[in-house]
UniProtKB/Swiss-Prot annotation, chains A, B:
Its cofactor is Mg(2+). S-adenosyl-L-methionine binds at residues 82-83, 88, 120, 169-171, 186-188. Its EC number is 2.1.1.278. Optimum pH is 7.5. The gene is IAMT1. Belongs to the methyltransferase superfamily. SABATH family. GO terms for molecular function: indole acetic acid carboxyl methyltransferase activity; indole-3-acetate carboxyl methyltransferase activity; metal ion binding; S-adenosylmethionine-dependent methyltransferase activity. This is Indole-3-acetate O-methyltransferase 1. Keywords: Magnesium, Metal-binding, Methyltransferase, S-adenosyl-L-methionine, Transferase.
Length: 404, 404
């Protein structure tokens, strides 16, 4: 089981803060198999598998509760928000289709037709996603059940659902009113819709001069990031509440943090707020990048605490919280030999690049971007042992249903 | 008003017969404006504009008749099949949304929410299409009407509908049952799902040895092409009948021919069955391409007669024919100076390349493909006057509704 960050860059990516490739973590773990054997990775892969199974269990629990509540329509619609280019999204959709079909079957009803929407920003590489889709299962009577009964192999060889791609931001409306039975969004909601304006405004007390992320920033900066996250999540919930069918459900997972302090971003802080920060400072001191250039760069990511997340859901009021937990996840660093400092350094640079490379290149160009990640690699290698020990993510995992 | 073929090649095109870029004609005329003044094009642009307006009128008539029949739901769904990378499709969708909104308004009802599906093969460049989409109009009460009232400029600046891309072949199922109000497909249905098998089988009496298109081919070849077209259209209609909502409608336009003889393909015949054919023969005689290589290449396009089209719709039986006409269209050749033989030759080669270039390159490679189109350009230049006079398309235009 690999710990890889699954973010991919499309060929035609239009660069903007909101268009950055998504951080993907659990989802990629969930659908990857094999690897180089137990203990070959930085963290214990068995512990990882446990976490992954636990989160998958949450999703299934969400679906089961929904099937208890809802009537059995002839059409079941699902939407995965922040689908990226695909394989993780396809795995989650397979879980949904299988579980819902089983629920229909256990009530002695014919399985519904499924329609699945894969949504992401217009800059996402939908072409790759669409070419990953297996061919549609011929809608012959009984064949859906046969396919599901045949297990995973068959389920990925054909596709027992109608598929569609939906370009747009999930911080606004994406679907007609009351049209979706189940929403999922895994590892996208920690991406803010934008860097908070005050944070880039040198006249503001929340100006994040000198720093490139909220981690270890001032109280005013931290408050601005928190406000942005909560405003974005509120807009997300307001749109979904309009789009969800009566009896529908939503499964959300995103980066989270265990600390109450917004300026202590945990794993995300270690990723963007320490050696990555120092690498920027290196470039400024070497005269490669001007100080103002660094000051105007900020990573639009925020790992919320459970409380911050819960407050937004409650204030919105449209959804009941069926489950809300902070789950300890793994490390984004993929290494075969955790004792090899050079390899750890490379893994750290690669992880950062996979997530923030597009943003960095758009801000200072590819050439200086490459220099930045070289500095990062060198610095991370010098702190390899500490990174191996301390680098891991927490995830907010949340199951919601429309409040009665 | 330009006569350009609007086919575009996506960057990640997976080549297969069915994945060839679509022939686009009317749709591009409909949404193009300006040009280099009256009479600057090969054909009289005013006559073209008349044809275009007439076909647009058919679409509006189809919509009006549908609005008479159907109840006013809160959600109106449209699907454009064979959307290619977009601008033509976006224009047609704008017409639909505007017309349907006006119909609701004239009955004193609130405009519905619109959901529009853009469908094409998985190899289509959906990324380009999605980046052409204007941003979603904020669903504020009254703003849809304001937008529509503001006319074309506003309608293209924002998007008063939810959009989704659907990858798949329209010769099979694409959507859930009874989920679409109106289908459109413009200039795609003349693409066969495949070259008829017999045509590529040297042991068959319908083997098309020596030729690369059905035009001027043997009776057996012509019959095989005709069978393939009719079988494909039947599969198209069967799927749409399942997917269309009660009271729904369908507007179809594709290449057609005025001759009763399937081996006389009219404009398509002139495009693929004369100088293009001779250019292949040149390469064979020069030893650049082996005879068998040419013999195994066939263009999977078929321009049906009205009667052939009508027979399939009647045999299927699910749809009533509200209108079925053969409309004289324009020429695919874009030239500023019709007297300039070299320019006419270039235009002919470009038109052929835009439609069949991907297929040719997949069959004999890019280098020899370029040689083929060079020969074509030279030959077409020698027959420039004849091409200017005789090259024009006919279009089958068809409006269908679910039979009661």
């Amino acid at each position: 089981m690999t710990m890889a960050m699954a973010s991919m860059k499309g060929e035609n990516v239009t660069v903007s803060a909101a268009a950055a490739p998504r951080m993907k973590k659990l989802a990629s773990m969930l659908c990857m198999k094999g690897g180089n054997g137990d203990g070959s990775y930085l963290n214990n892969s068995q512990a990882q598998a446990l976490h992954a199974r636990r989160m998958l269990h949450f999703l299934e629990e969400t679906l089961d509760a929904m099937m208890e509540r809802s009537s059995s329509d002839k059409l079941f619609t699902a939407a995965d928000l922040g689908c990226s280019c695909g394989s993780n999204s396809l795995f989650i959709v397979d879980v949904i289709v299988r579980r819902v079909s089983e629920a229909y079957e256990s009530r002695g009803r014919d399985a519904p037709e499924f329609q699945v929407f894969f949504s992401d920003l217009p800059s996402n590489d939908f072409n790759t996603l669409f070419q990953l889709l297996p061919p549609l299962l011929a809608p012959v009577a009984g064949s859906l059940e046969e396919c599901l009964a045949a297990g995973e192999g068959a389920a990925t060889a054909t596709r027992p659902y109608h598929a569609a791609g939906v370009p747009g931001t999930f911080y606004g409306r994406l679907f007609p009113g009351e049209s979706i039975d189940v929403f999922t969004s895994t590892f996208s909601l920690h991406w803010l819709s934008q860097v908070p304006e005050e944070v880039g405004d040198s006249a503001s007390p929340a100006y994040n001069g000198g720093r490139v992320f909220v981690h270890r920033a001032t109280e005013a900066v931290a408050a601005a990031y928190k406000r942005q996250f909560q405003a974005d999540l509120a807009r997300f919930l307001r749109s979904r509440a309009r789009e969800m069918k009566r009896g529908g459900a939503m499964f959300l997972a995103c980066l989270g943090r265990s600390s109450g302090d917004p300026a202590d971003q945990g794993g995300a802080g270690l990723l963007f707020g320490t050696h990555f920060q120092d690498a920027w400072d290196d470039l400024v001191q070497e005269g490669v990048v001007e100080g103002e250039k660094r000051d105007s760069f900020n990573i639009p990511v925020y790992a919320p605490s459970l409380q911050e997340f819960r407050d937004v859901v409650r204030a919105d009021g449209a959804f009941a919280i069926d489950r809300l937990e902070l789950v300890r996840g793994g490390s984004p660093l993929v290494v075969d030999r955790p004792d090899d400092a050079a390899e750890v350094g490379r893994a750290m640079a690669n992880s950062c690049k996979a997530v923030a490379g597009v943003l960095v290149d758009a801000h200072i160009g590819e050439r200086r971007g490459a220099q930045l990640f070289e500095r990062l690699e060198r610095r991370a290698a010098r702190h390899a042992r500490e990174l191996v020990e301390k680098m891991h993510f927490f995830h907010v995992v949340c199951s919601l249903s429309l409040a009665p």
